[in-house]
Swiss-Prot record:
It comes from Saccharomyces cerevisiae (strain ATCC 204508 / S288c). This is Ammonia regulation of amino acid uptake protein. Sequence repeats lie at residues 48-57, 58-67. The gene is AUA1. Induction: Repressed in presence of ammonia. Involved in ammonia regulation of the GAP1 permease.
Amino acid sequence: MDRSLQVYICMYPYLDGSKQYRFDELISFYRPCPKSLDNIKSHYRQIHHQIRRRTHQHHQIRRRTHQHHHRSNCSRQRQCLVRHSCGRQMRVLA
């Protein structure tokens, strides 16, 4: 992974709810880390789609009890927090 660009993405928690996926944990399962911000969105969408497929049944169960409580928070757009080596942070809608 390119350490000059550390990327942490808010994604689905692990199924036991213990923690959230970290971007550099995910890329070891899928494909090499994108080297530029231009590639992060499309890369994130691919990972997001694969995880959605794998956890679809789990989310169908959770959605029945969860959706009416936080309907506005359950949008499909998730925010990526991009942290550069210089300390600058920016949020990217994926």
